[in-house]
Protein backbone atom coordinates (compact mmCIF):
# COMPACT_ATOMS: atom_id res chain seq x y z
CA UNK A 1 0.00 0.00 0.00
CA UNK A 2 2.86 2.40 0.79
CA UNK A 3 4.32 1.64 -2.64
CA UNK A 4 1.03 2.38 -4.39
CA UNK A 5 0.77 5.82 -2.80
CA UNK A 6 4.42 6.57 -3.52
CA UNK A 7 3.92 5.53 -7.14
CA UNK A 8 0.99 7.97 -7.24
CA UNK A 9 3.35 10.79 -6.27
CA UNK A 10 3.09 11.00 -2.48
CA UNK A 11 6.15 12.54 -0.85
CA UNK A 12 5.31 11.34 2.67
CA UNK A 13 3.81 8.06 3.84
CA UNK A 14 2.44 7.49 7.32
CA UNK A 15 3.29 4.47 9.40
CA UNK A 16 0.44 2.04 10.03
CA UNK A 17 0.41 2.99 13.72
CA UNK A 18 -2.68 5.17 14.12
CA UNK A 19 -4.08 2.66 16.64
CA UNK A 20 -0.78 1.22 17.83
CA UNK A 21 -0.66 2.70 21.32
CA UNK A 22 -0.78 0.37 24.30
CA UNK A 23 -4.21 1.77 25.18
CA UNK A 24 -5.70 0.49 21.93
CA UNK A 25 -3.63 -2.67 21.65
CA UNK A 26 -4.60 -3.70 25.19
CA UNK A 27 -8.19 -3.92 23.94
CA UNK A 28 -7.01 -6.77 21.70
CA UNK A 29 -4.76 -8.40 24.28
CA UNK A 30 -1.51 -7.43 22.57
CA UNK A 31 -0.44 -4.32 24.47
CA UNK A 32 2.82 -6.05 25.38
CA UNK A 33 3.76 -5.91 21.68
CA UNK A 34 3.46 -2.13 21.38
CA UNK A 35 7.14 -1.44 20.70
CA UNK A 36 7.41 -4.40 18.33
CA UNK A 37 4.36 -3.37 16.28
CA UNK A 38 5.49 0.24 15.96
CA UNK A 39 9.01 -0.78 14.98
CA UNK A 40 7.67 -3.16 12.32
CA UNK A 41 5.44 -0.44 10.89
CA UNK A 42 8.36 1.97 10.59
CA UNK A 43 10.48 -0.73 8.96
CA UNK A 44 7.73 -1.38 6.39
CA UNK A 45 7.48 2.30 5.51
CA UNK A 46 11.24 2.78 5.33
CA UNK A 47 11.50 -0.23 3.03
CA UNK A 48 8.90 1.36 0.76
CA UNK A 49 10.79 4.65 0.41
CA UNK A 50 14.19 3.00 -0.08
CA UNK A 51 15.71 4.21 -3.32
CA UNK A 52 13.21 7.06 -3.58
CA UNK A 53 15.00 10.35 -2.82
CA UNK A 54 12.87 13.10 -1.37
CA UNK A 55 10.41 10.69 0.23
CA UNK A 56 9.81 10.54 3.99
CA UNK A 57 8.26 8.42 6.72
CA UNK A 58 5.83 10.07 9.13
CA UNK A 59 5.10 8.40 12.46
CA UNK A 60 1.33 8.40 13.01
CA UNK A 61 -0.09 8.75 16.53
CA UNK A 62 -3.86 8.57 16.83
CA UNK A 63 -6.03 9.87 19.67
CA UNK A 64 -6.36 6.40 21.23
CA UNK A 65 -9.88 5.44 22.28
CA UNK A 66 -9.91 7.52 25.48
CA UNK A 67 -10.48 11.24 25.94
CA UNK A 68 -9.02 12.70 29.16
CA UNK A 69 -11.41 15.68 29.21
CA UNK A 70 -14.31 13.25 29.46
CA UNK A 71 -12.67 11.24 32.24
CA UNK A 72 -12.02 8.17 30.09
CA UNK A 73 -8.39 7.98 31.19
CA UNK A 74 -6.03 9.64 33.65
CA UNK A 75 -3.41 12.09 32.39
CA UNK A 76 -0.64 9.87 33.74
CA UNK A 77 -1.90 6.80 31.89
CA UNK A 78 -2.29 8.69 28.62
CA UNK A 79 1.15 10.25 28.98
CA UNK A 80 2.75 6.85 29.60
CA UNK A 81 1.09 5.41 26.50
CA UNK A 82 2.23 8.27 24.30
CA UNK A 83 5.77 8.09 25.66
CA UNK A 84 6.01 4.38 24.89
CA UNK A 85 4.75 4.75 21.33
CA UNK A 86 6.79 7.88 20.64
CA UNK A 87 9.96 6.21 21.83
CA UNK A 88 9.38 3.21 19.57
CA UNK A 89 8.64 5.38 16.53
CA UNK A 90 11.59 7.72 17.00
CA UNK A 91 14.10 4.99 17.79
CA UNK A 92 12.90 3.08 14.72
CA UNK A 93 13.73 6.00 12.45
CA UNK A 94 10.72 8.15 11.51
CA UNK A 95 11.49 11.43 9.77
CA UNK A 96 8.63 13.34 11.37
CA UNK A 97 5.73 12.80 13.78
CA UNK A 98 2.03 13.47 13.37
CA UNK A 99 -0.50 13.67 16.18
CA UNK A 100 -3.65 13.23 14.13
CA UNK A 101 -7.43 13.10 14.41
CA UNK A 102 -7.11 15.06 17.66
CA UNK A 103 -10.48 15.58 19.33
CA UNK A 104 -9.58 16.93 22.77
CA UNK A 105 -7.31 19.91 23.51
CA UNK A 106 -6.27 18.41 26.84
CA UNK A 107 -5.24 15.27 24.99
CA UNK A 108 -3.21 17.29 22.47
CA UNK A 109 -1.39 19.24 25.17
CA UNK A 110 -0.51 16.08 27.09
CA UNK A 111 0.70 14.44 23.88
CA UNK A 112 2.82 17.42 22.85
CA UNK A 113 4.43 17.89 26.25
CA UNK A 114 5.25 14.18 26.27
CA UNK A 115 6.51 14.35 22.70
CA UNK A 116 8.98 17.17 23.23
CA UNK A 117 10.15 15.72 26.55
CA UNK A 118 10.72 12.34 24.91
CA UNK A 119 12.63 13.86 22.00
CA UNK A 120 14.85 15.75 24.43
CA UNK A 121 15.50 12.61 26.46
CA UNK A 122 16.40 10.69 23.30
CA UNK A 123 18.58 13.52 22.04
CA UNK A 124 16.66 13.68 18.77
CA UNK A 125 15.18 16.50 16.71
CA UNK A 126 12.11 15.40 14.77
CA UNK A 127 9.50 17.77 13.29
CA UNK A 128 6.13 17.49 15.01
CA UNK A 129 2.80 18.07 13.24
CA UNK A 130 -0.67 18.29 14.78
CA UNK A 131 -3.91 17.67 12.93
CA UNK A 132 -7.24 18.26 14.63
CA UNK A 133 -10.62 16.82 13.70
CA UNK A 134 -13.66 19.09 13.63
CA UNK A 135 -17.09 17.59 13.10
CA UNK A 136 -19.83 19.08 10.91
CA UNK A 137 -21.01 20.87 14.05
CA UNK A 138 -17.92 23.06 13.68
CA UNK A 139 -16.23 21.81 16.83
CA UNK A 140 -14.11 18.96 18.11
CA UNK A 141 -15.86 16.14 19.96
CA UNK A 142 -15.42 17.90 23.30
CA UNK A 143 -16.77 21.21 21.96
CA UNK A 144 -13.64 23.24 21.19
CA UNK A 145 -13.59 25.27 17.97
CA UNK A 146 -10.72 26.08 15.61
CA UNK A 147 -9.95 29.35 17.40
CA UNK A 148 -9.52 27.61 20.75
CA UNK A 149 -7.30 24.99 19.13
CA UNK A 150 -5.09 27.59 17.46
CA UNK A 151 -4.64 29.63 20.64
CA UNK A 152 -3.87 26.51 22.66
CA UNK A 153 -1.26 25.19 20.24
CA UNK A 154 0.50 28.39 19.21
CA UNK A 155 3.06 28.27 22.07
CA UNK A 156 4.36 24.86 20.92
CA UNK A 157 7.17 24.67 18.31
CA UNK A 158 5.10 22.81 15.73
CA UNK A 159 6.14 22.06 12.17
CA UNK A 160 2.51 22.50 11.15
CA UNK A 161 -1.08 22.56 12.34
CA UNK A 162 -4.18 21.68 10.38
CA UNK A 163 -7.20 19.44 9.94
CA UNK A 164 -7.93 15.86 8.99
CA UNK A 165 -10.79 13.36 8.97
CA UNK A 166 -14.52 13.70 9.84
CA UNK A 167 -15.51 15.61 6.67
CA UNK A 168 -14.58 16.26 3.09
CA UNK A 169 -12.70 19.39 1.99
CA UNK A 170 -15.84 21.50 1.52
CA UNK A 171 -16.68 21.37 5.23
CA UNK A 172 -13.15 22.48 6.14
CA UNK A 173 -13.16 25.74 4.20
CA UNK A 174 -14.29 28.04 7.02
CA UNK A 175 -11.78 26.55 9.46
CA UNK A 176 -8.90 26.85 7.00
CA UNK A 177 -9.95 30.43 6.23
CA UNK A 178 -9.61 31.16 9.93
CA UNK A 179 -6.15 29.57 10.11
CA UNK A 180 -5.10 31.48 6.99
CA UNK A 181 -5.30 34.71 8.97
CA UNK A 182 -4.71 33.50 12.53
CA UNK A 183 -2.15 30.67 12.46
CA UNK A 184 1.47 31.86 12.06
CA UNK A 185 2.95 28.56 10.90
CA UNK A 186 2.38 26.01 8.15
CA UNK A 187 -1.16 24.73 7.57
CA UNK A 188 -2.03 21.16 6.62
CA UNK A 189 -5.27 19.77 5.17
CA UNK A 190 -6.03 16.04 4.90
CA UNK A 191 -9.79 15.54 4.43
CA UNK A 192 -11.87 12.44 3.98
CA UNK A 193 -13.28 11.76 0.52
CA UNK A 194 -16.54 13.40 1.45
CA UNK A 195 -18.94 12.06 4.05
CA UNK A 196 -19.21 8.28 4.32
CA UNK A 197 -22.32 6.42 3.22
CA UNK A 198 -23.39 2.85 3.80
CA UNK A 199 -23.86 1.02 0.50
CA UNK A 200 -24.80 -2.65 0.59
CA UNK A 201 -23.56 -2.83 4.15
CA UNK A 202 -20.17 -1.31 3.29
CA UNK A 203 -18.76 2.14 4.01
CA UNK A 204 -18.37 4.13 0.80
CA UNK A 205 -16.95 7.56 0.00
CA UNK A 206 -18.40 9.42 -2.99
CA UNK A 207 -15.90 12.21 -3.67
CA UNK A 208 -14.13 11.41 -6.93
CA UNK A 209 -10.41 12.08 -7.51
CA UNK A 210 -10.85 14.97 -9.95
CA UNK A 211 -13.24 16.89 -7.71
CA UNK A 212 -11.14 16.18 -4.62
CA UNK A 213 -8.07 17.53 -6.40
CA UNK A 214 -9.94 20.63 -7.60
CA UNK A 215 -11.07 21.51 -4.08
CA UNK A 216 -7.63 20.85 -2.61
CA UNK A 217 -5.94 23.06 -5.19
CA UNK A 218 -7.99 25.98 -3.89
CA UNK A 219 -6.62 25.45 -0.38
CA UNK A 220 -3.09 25.85 -1.72
CA UNK A 221 -3.65 28.57 -4.30
CA UNK A 222 -6.09 30.74 -2.33
CA UNK A 223 -5.59 29.89 1.36
CA UNK A 224 -1.84 29.37 1.59
CA UNK A 225 -1.98 25.74 2.68
CA UNK A 226 1.41 24.09 2.22
CA UNK A 227 0.78 20.45 3.24
CA UNK A 228 -1.99 18.47 1.56
CA UNK A 229 -3.08 14.85 1.61
CA UNK A 230 -6.04 12.63 2.32
CA UNK A 231 -7.63 10.69 5.14
CA UNK A 232 -10.47 8.13 5.13
CA UNK A 233 -11.53 6.93 1.69
CA UNK A 234 -8.39 8.25 0.00
CA UNK A 235 -7.05 6.02 -2.77
CA UNK A 236 -3.88 6.24 -4.84
CA UNK A 237 -6.06 7.69 -7.61
CA UNK A 238 -7.03 10.60 -5.33
CA UNK A 239 -3.38 11.28 -4.49
CA UNK A 240 -2.34 11.05 -8.14
CA UNK A 241 -4.97 13.63 -9.07
CA UNK A 242 -3.95 15.83 -6.14
CA UNK A 243 -0.28 15.74 -7.10
CA UNK A 244 -1.10 16.80 -10.64
CA UNK A 245 -3.44 19.56 -9.45
CA UNK A 246 -0.90 21.24 -7.16
CA UNK A 247 2.32 20.39 -8.98
CA UNK A 248 2.92 23.92 -10.27
CA UNK A 249 0.99 25.82 -7.60
CA UNK A 250 2.74 27.82 -4.91
CA UNK A 251 0.94 28.39 -1.59
CA UNK A 252 -0.68 31.80 -1.55
CA UNK A 253 1.03 34.45 0.55
CA UNK A 254 -0.72 34.89 3.88
CA UNK A 255 -1.08 37.85 6.21
CA UNK A 256 -1.56 36.75 9.81
CA UNK A 257 -3.50 39.16 11.99
CA UNK A 258 -1.53 40.43 14.96
What are these regions (language model features)?
Residues 1-258:
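Domain-level signal for soluble alpha/beta catalytic cores
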Amino acid sequence: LHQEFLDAGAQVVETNTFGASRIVLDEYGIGNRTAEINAAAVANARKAIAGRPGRYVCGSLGPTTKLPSLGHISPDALTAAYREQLTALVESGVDLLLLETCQDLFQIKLALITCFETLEQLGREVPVMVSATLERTGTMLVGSDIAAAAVTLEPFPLFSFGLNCATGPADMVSHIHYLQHQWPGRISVMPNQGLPEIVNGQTAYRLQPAEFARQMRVFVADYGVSIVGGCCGTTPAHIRALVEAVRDVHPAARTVDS
